[in-house]
Amino acid sequence: MWKDEYLRWMNEPTLDLELKKDLLNKTEKELEEIFYGPLTFGTGGIRGILGAGINRLNIYTIRKANDGLARYLLKTKGDIAKLQGVVIAHDNRRMSKEFALESAKVLGAYGIKSFLFEDLRPTPELSFATRYLKAAAGIVITASHNPPNYNGYKIYDEFGCQFTPQFADVIVSMVNEVTDLFQIKTVSKEVLIEKHLLTYIGQEIDELYLNEVKSIQINPQVKKDIKIVFTPLHGTSAELGLSLLESTGYLVYPVLEQMVHDSSFSTVKSPNPENASAFEMAIALGKKVDADLLIATDPDADRLGVAVKQGNDYVLLTGNQTGAILINYILSERKKQGTLPENGVVFNTIVTSDLGAKIARAYGFNVIQTLTGFKYIGEQIRYLENTNQEFIFGYEESYGYVIKGFVRDKDSLQALLLASEAAAYYQHYENKTLLEKLNDIYETYGVHQEALHNIDLFGIEGAKRIQAIVERFRVNPLTSINHQNVMVFEDYLYSYRIEKGYKTALSFDKTNAVKYILENGSWFVLRPSGTEPKLKIYIGVTGKTVESARIELDSIGQAILALVDQIK
């Protein structure tokens, strides 16, 4: 019962006083929400609201996660894990720095060394550092682009990739073995330093990482006669992102108000480059300086948003559109230079547009689809190392891209450099913007349009309704929708596909999602978010014109939402 857990916290003599105050200010309903069950690992690790309780992120739940990780590393690697150590980074959020040090204190109690970044750093740099330092694992304290009252905890394997379920599930089971959050052993910072269990890292890793990022350039000597507005949205790319662009010769105008590491993200409604509102200050500056390109990264610098000048205003590209532009640029330019491999591979996910895959296949390359979550792409990049195939590009619709595998997660710094280069190249050689180039791509491969509907459903009742909706689409699959017959149904939880009445097995890991593909090539996916209390509905269509594709997109969306609304 949640009340028993609540009383345990209230009667705990060592409970942090601020957290105790937090509990005293809660209503009974609020207390039930924060004690009904523990935080769980999702597609992006653990994310939760800051505060007291087992369903909130605080020093005790952070200790619990690290205790499980420490025991997992010692069980699977033995004492070598102590020498390899764990790399730890954090973002600009409230309690991030404290949680990062708290992680080192728990690991140190098990004799495991920590390499702790001296200040906030981009998540992709954590992936790089874990690989470079040959560490046993990596940790980053971040909630990505979630609201300011959230924080999070992500763990990476020795290859710099987020743990996939077969390993993460073992870690989670070991985390859940912790029954008393107040008895977890820690050691002080002073003891960590005295016993050489804590090493601070920073500038030397920055330089190595940035040199690798610069290696992705295809036409580094292209004339850079474009103006770029850059905003880190108060996050971790402020220093490295600006330095990267300026050191490679671009004229950059940073949004100064958003270069500040503000944990409240006070200048934006949401620090998410997927949202148009996040670009408001960048657009204002862009109009002032007549910029050609606007670039925004999310707070932990793994996602990239791009906006392109059109007339007197700016058009925001979707993640799918940016991905298509980047893959087209990589393949066309490397083909000109004769640097394309014979057996190149491109990765995307089950909710990503078909456009990038069509481009890759037109160049004769294999396209491998993964489940949602960049950890699956990172895992696949590693698998290629023992084959004669070469990684070309990986991306997903949610504004995540990776060009080279020295990082095994999405990397906004790689993406912003290549997007800037593509914009400069097309401007100089074809007198075209990225938006005009996208229209060229549409002419060749067809117009592709996508949409994402987020349905927020909070708390215990919300979680139940999300499950009920997905189950309705799973247990009783539709045979048609929006006057289109269903041609393919895929269930990723029970790992099967039905096409033309024939049932075949899917080889993906299991995840709670279903996909429908219609006779006209349109498709949609329903899945609960792995990091937030919401149901996600992804839709993709193709058409001869942008207008006809958007009409189809809206029509399918309305039909799905009408069905969802009937499920209580």
Q: What name fits each language-model region?
A:
Residues 28-35, 39, 151-278:
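Gly/Ser/Thr-enriched, mixed-charge loops and adjacent short helices
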Residues 87-150, 246, 251-306:
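N-terminal small/polar loop signature for handling phosphorylated ligands or for N-terminal nucleophile
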Residues 4-103, 196-228, 236:
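An N-terminal, well-structured beta->alpha segment
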Residues 287, 291-293, 333-527, 534-536, ...:
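Phosphate-binding and adjacent anionic-ligand microenvironments
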Residues 97-102, 127-131, 149-155, 239-244, ...:
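Short acidic, glycine/serine/threonine-rich loops at helix termini
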Residues 35-55, 143-146, 232-240, 244, ...:
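Conserved phosphate/anionic-ligand binding catalytic regions in large, soluble enzymes, centered on
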